[in-house]
């Protein structure tokens, strides 16, 4: 059974190297999806952190605030919690930036592979989602 239109034949041979490139493309797509999901979670966490920072600033400075460390909550002064939240926000910003860099690298490699594979296979291959 052929998937080409009737009367059209596929004369393109798939070499081992071509198959390796197709497999790499598939792996990169899966990695990109995982990074996109992680990036979404980190951005959401950053939003929550920003919201909490704004709320903490409204609290009286002498009032102790519960701050989550691992699985437990400890009481800290408002100023220390604010400083810790700033450190956490900076850590998240760095993580988001790293993930975005990875995503850009994957996108550039995907574009290169698309160009190579479409040049060889033309309409005989579909690399779009």
From Swiss-Prot:
Subunit note: Heterohexamer of two PFD-alpha type and four PFD-beta type subunits.
Species this protein is from: Saccharomyces cerevisiae (strain ATCC 204508 / S288c)
The protein, known as: Prefoldin subunit 4
GO molecular function, one term: tubulin binding
Further comment found in the protein's record: Present with 7470 molecules/cell in log phase SD medium.
Top-level taxon: Eukaryota
Annotated function: Binds specifically to cytosolic chaperonin (c-CPN) and transfers target proteins to it. Binds to nascent polypeptide chain and promotes folding in an environment in which there are many competing pathways for nonnative proteins.
InterPro entries with a match to the protein in the record: PFD_beta-like (IPR002777), PFDN4 (IPR016661), Prefoldin (IPR009053)
């Amino acid at each position: 059974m052929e998937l080409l239109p009737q009367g059209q034949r596929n004369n393109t041979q798939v070499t081992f190297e071509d198959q390796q490139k197709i497999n790499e493309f598939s792996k990169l797509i899966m990695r990109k999806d995982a990074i996109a999901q992680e990036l979404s979670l980190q951005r959401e966490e950053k939003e929550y952190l920003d919201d909490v920072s704004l709320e903490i600033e409204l609290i009286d400075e002498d009032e102790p605030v519960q701050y989550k460390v691992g699985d437990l909550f400890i009481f800290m002064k408002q100023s220390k919690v604010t400083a810790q939240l700033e450190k956490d926000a900076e850590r998240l910003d760095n993580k988001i930036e790293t993930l975005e860099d990875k995503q850009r690298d994957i996108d550039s490699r995907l574009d290169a592979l698309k160009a190579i594979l479409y040049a060889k296979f033309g309409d005989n291959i579909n690399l779009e989602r």
